[in-house]
UniProtKB/Swiss-Prot annotation:
Residues annotated as transmembrane: none
Enzyme superclass (EC): translocase
Membrane association type: Peripheral membrane protein
All residue ranges annotated as the ABC transporter domain in the record: 2-241
InterPro entries found in the cross-reference section: AAA+_ATPase, ABC_Ni/Peptide_Import, ABC_transporter-like_ATP-bd, ABC_transporter-like_CS, Nickel_NikD, P-loop_NTPase
Organism per entry: Shigella boydii serotype 4 (strain Sb227)
Protein name: Nickel import ATP-binding protein NikD
Membership in a protein family: Belongs to the ABC transporter superfamily. Nickel importer (TC 3.A.1.5.3) family.
Gene symbol of the encoding locus: nikD
UniProt keywords, alphabetically: ATP-binding, Cell inner membrane, Cell membrane, Ion transport, Membrane, Nickel, Nickel transport, Nucleotide-binding, Translocase, Transport
Assembly description: The complex is composed of two ATP-binding proteins (NikD and NikE), two transmembrane proteins (NikB and NikC) and a solute-binding protein (NikA).
Reactions this protein catalyses: Ni(2+)(out) + ATP + H2O = Ni(2+)(in) + ADP + phosphate + H(+)
Positions contributing to ATP binding: G36, G37, S38, G39, S40, G41, K42, S43
S-S bonds: none
The enzyme's E.C. designation: 7.2.2.11
Length: 254
């Protein structure tokens, strides 16, 4: 399995250019946070990595490399990169139980799909009474439960990399904290490389090792989390850090 995934000069276009020459490097055991405002191109960059661009959007330049070798995005999905999506309710088939979702995921990747394996993954993400959870349909579960189930399926993939696209969006504060605890636990126990897409600098401060700031389809600043918080250079970065510090009655040094 690869130790590094590199996005090199990715450019995306629809009726007009959307993402301009984005380069990022994911490394096993490290969390790279991709931050920026809505519409900055974060989720499109993730979609390009997985080869699941929306209709009408095409990649016009760039490549993806695994340990220095060019690869097709479709060869990464599931096997090398697991995904935790922004809106879990739209990610599950409403006609299938959690057991069907989990089992199909395992079978598609050639992983064990026995009930003991599924139960262990569900228990690992803190969902109680795994036997009951496996019988539930998506509409019978809360947003927090569905997000935990999506993380359980990422665990089942046993992929060396994870893309987590706004994993705490639309969750209440308690559910957000539990999801962050889970992601932190996964990093400690399995040490995957993680691309964490978020607009919440509090999440960045807690989980990230490195940060890339995106604005208008471009990476405007990139560095380790400590440097970025203490000495942000770009206007967008300074605005993000300043807004975060203001929540705690603090100001960014000029």
């Amino acid at each position: 399995m690869p130790q590094q995934i590199e996005l090199r000069n990715i450019a995306l276009q629809a009726a007009q250019p959307l993402v301009h020459g984005v380069s990022l490097t994911l490394q096993r055991g490290r969390v790279l946070a991709l931050v920026g405002g809505s519409g900055s191109g974060k989720s499109l960059t993730c979609a390009a990595t997985l080869g699941i661009l929306p209709a009408g959007v095409r990649q016009t330049a760039g490549e993806i490399l695994a340990d220095g070798k060019a690869v097709y995005p479709c060869a990464l999905r599931g096997i090398k990169i697991a995904t935790i999506m922004q809106n879990p309710r739209s990610a599950f088939n409403p006609l299938h139980t959690m057991h069907t979702h989990a089992r199909e995921t395992c079978l598609a990747l050639g992983k064990p799909a026995d009930d003991a394996t599924l139960t262990a993954a569900i228990e690992a993400v803190g969902l109680e009474n795994a036997a009951r959870v496996l019988k539930l349909y998506p509409f019978e579960m809360s947003g927090g439960m569905l997000q935990r189930m999506m993380i359980a399926m990422a665990v089942l993939c046993e992929s060396p990399f994870i893309i987590a696209d706004e994993p705490t969006t639309d969750l209440d504060v308690v559910a957000q904290a539990r999801i962050l605890d889970l992601l932190e636990s996964i990093m400690q126990k399995q040490a995957p490389g993680m691309l964490l897409v978020t607009h919440d600098m509090g999440v960045v401060a807690r989980l990230a090792d490195d940060v890339a700031v995106m604005s208008q389809g471009k990476i405007v600043e990139q560095g380790d989390v400590e440097t970025l918080f203490n000495a942000p250079k770009h206007t967008v970065t300074r605005s993000l850090v300043s807004a975060h510090l203001a929540l705690y009655g603090m100001e960014l040094a000029s």
